Amino acid sequence: MPVKEKVGIVVSNKMQKTIVVKVESRYSHPIYSKTMTKTRKYLAHDEMGECNIGDQVLVQECRPLSKRKRWTLSKVLSKSSLVS
């Protein structure tokens, strides 16, 4: 079975070795046919602490690392222009 991957934007990096990634998915409403955007936040493991807020990242599913953390940082796709 292939590993699940998601692309999202880092919204928080205040925890040690953990980032919060916002992933948006678009779908069509079954009755009204309006395009809706669903946003979900995932906790991901960032071993080296290389991510900053606003970075676009690729995360992969992995074994449970804690109660809510089941994703790991695969790579940083683009760095944010915001400097913290």
From Swiss-Prot:
Subcellular location: Plastid, Chloroplast
PROSITE patterns: RIBOSOMAL_S17 (PS00056)
Pfam families the record matches: Ribosomal_S17 (PF00366)
Molecular function GO terms recorded: rRNA binding; structural constituent of ribosome
GO BP annotation list: translation
GO cellular component assignments: chloroplast; mitochondrion; ribonucleoprotein complex; ribosome
Keyword Chloroplast attached: yes
Keyword set, alphabetical order: Chloroplast, Plastid, Ribonucleoprotein, Ribosomal protein, RNA-binding, rRNA-binding
SUPFAM superfamilies linked to this entry: Nucleic acid-binding proteins
Residues spanning the signal sequence: none
Recorded family membership: Belongs to the universal ribosomal protein uS17 family.
Assembly and binders: Part of the 30S ribosomal subunit.
Function text: One of the primary rRNA binding proteins, it binds specifically to the 5'-end of 16S ribosomal RNA.
Identification of the protein by name: Small ribosomal subunit protein uS17c
Organism from which the protein derives: Trieres chinensis (Marine centric diatom)
Gene label: rps17
